[in-house]
Amino acid sequence: STVEDLTRTTFWKTGAFSLENNYEYAGPGIELYCGTEWRLITLNFGRSFKDQQPVIKRIVERLPITLEINLISFFLAYFIGVPLGLLLAVKRNTVVDRIVTTGTFMLWSLPSFWVGMLLILFFCNKEFFYWFPASGIRSLQVDATWSFWEILTDHIHHMVLPVIASTYSSFAGISRFMRTSVLDNLQQDYVRTAEAKGLRSSVVLLRHVVRNSLIPIVTLMANLLPGMIAGSVFIETIFTIPGLGLLSFQSVIIRDYPMAMALFFIGGGLSLLGILIADILLKITDPRIDFSKTQT
């Protein structure tokens, strides 16, 4: 009817006007563009559609747990992957090399969400091994009467499976890159020259080959920072970890556009930061690189 159409039109106009004013979407195009750029620079992403809380506040609340998982996974991946790749290069074409190489290829190809579900199935199920909790970052029984060490132990107990699920693929990939890089360097002339001068093979390997082999490994770090959000989506969703990954998934599902856009913007910024850090580390590991000289 006419009354219903008028009511519906009035409702949508009122709602649109309210949204435009609350989220500063009203005005000429150039003002909208400049305002948006300024809000991005100042990290003012507006308020969440879900609870009207400032977006940056909710991101800061979720950031520590995502940082914790990713930093632990980062150090574990390099701590395991680099020595393992070096060992496989030294033991090339042996039974150990072939078995471990096959295993790392399999780990590298497994999707994280599938591995996460398998971990929950086998290690959080009374029918198999009920060793770890399936979700969360702490037990429901935690209260003020618990000591610091009890809370820390409980938290570590909850973090074991998420860290494993986010580390296995990284260390497998790093070990493969490290093995290839070491084998390439072992064929270089400087290795034969050093051995001809009487240096022991272990000295040549650890002092010269390893450092040069780390150069391509360093460039992989450019993908680690943006992976803090993208790579955490599956892990945090499967294990119900209240971090940025789960927040990203929930924001997309409920169409919380300010939150989703803020997380995508931060992900893009982390990509650029990762590339910058990789370039700096590349200069440290490769003394041949000199940014002060310009190519003519």
Residue ranges and their predicted role:
Residues K50, T101, A134, L206, ...:
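Phosphate-coordinating loops and pocket residues in cytosolic domains that bind phosphorylated ligands
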Residues L84, V96-T104, G116:
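Hydrophobic, well-ordered secondary-structure segments
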Residues L6-T7, A16-G27, W131-W149:
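Compositionally biased, charge-rich terminal segments
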Residues L40, N44, K50, E127, ...:
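Residue-level signal for pocket-adjacent positions within structured domains
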Residues S1, G103-G136, H158, A165-F171:
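Membrane-water interface segments at the C-terminal ends of transmembrane alpha-helices
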Residues S1-V82:
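An internal, D/E-rich "acidic patch" concept
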Residues L63-E68, I72-V96, S112, N125, ...:
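Alpha-helical transmembrane segments of integral membrane proteins
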